[in-house]
Amino acid sequence: MQETRLISKSLLRKSFSSVASPIKPKWLKIKLPSSKTLETKKIVNRQNLTTVCEEALCPNLNDCWSNKHATFMILGDVCTRSCSFCNIQTGKPKSVDKFEPLKVAKAVKDLELKHVVITSVDRDDLPDGGALHFYKTIKMIKKFSPNISIEILTPDFKNKENYLEIISSCAINVFNHNLETVKNLYDIIRPGANYLHSLSLLKSIKNTNKNILTKSGIMVGLGEQLIEIKELFNDLRSSNVDFLTIGQYLRPSLNHYPVIEYYDQDYFDFLKKIAIEMGFKAVTSSPFARSSYKSAEEHEIVKSKMNH
């Protein structure tokens, strides 16, 4: 296993563009669009919706969309935070679209989905961080598709009112909130977020509604050490998190945080083995794994385990 290349945080703060990433391996290739991918795009565009698949430049877009899997991003496409790894634009968001829950529900029905993932940008400008809009969207989806399973991937609702009561009362199967990286890198990778608060959010959701499965995801290749990854795994299990996704960080542009290291599938298999041994019910671990990638399959795996 290669030794991780370390770069000082003070240098990174001055200018991300001045720090080069290692050459991307040839095996990190993305599939070309198919006709089924374009069909999904047509349905999404018909309702004038946003997907995190497009906004975050997800490497699995063509794979997921060709199978009619999409992660809908509600509450607009402008985030109030500016995380150094993320491609979503930051600034002052527009007002909330009150018709968005209906639009999402119609798209989900048109796609004939059995499982859907709903996420959002951070909305620090809203009193509840957008929690009530999540609730309304989920309620409308259930009205149009009563038998669907739903996963939500939420921001941290830091310093927001009544979010816990609202979110835990949603008719969801999986609550997902990503830690993204190890505690030591939070101040530069996730400025504005707090590692302990994110853990507390995951634990509180589980404690409030034990029927909801909880999930989190991380990226590797940011300069984290193995001992820090193990500590993160332990923190998640101590918070009773059920699912885990582990993926390779891919730099969206030169203005974003650089890739410190690329890892092959052997390393991801190694991390998965550690995570499974720690007690996670399902782990998706590969260079292209993202938080909502194969979420339907994960949900079925855990349901099967719980029924036996």
List each language-model region with its residue ranges.
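Auxiliary Fe-S-binding modules of radical SAM enzymes
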Residues: 1-71, 75, 102-106, 136-148, ...
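Short cysteine clusters
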Residues: 58, 79, 83-86
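Short functional micro-motifs and their immediate structural scaffolds
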Residues: 63-66, 84, 88-91
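Residues that cap or initiate secondary-structure elements
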Residues: 78-80, 92, 158, 224
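Glycine/Thr-rich phosphate-binding loops of Rossmann-like dinucleotide-binding domains
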Residues: 82, 126, 185, 254, ...
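Alpha-helical elements of the RecA-like P-loop NTPase motor core of helicases
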Residues: 84, 187, 227
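Core AdoMet radical
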Residues: 87-103, 110-161, 167-201, 215, ...
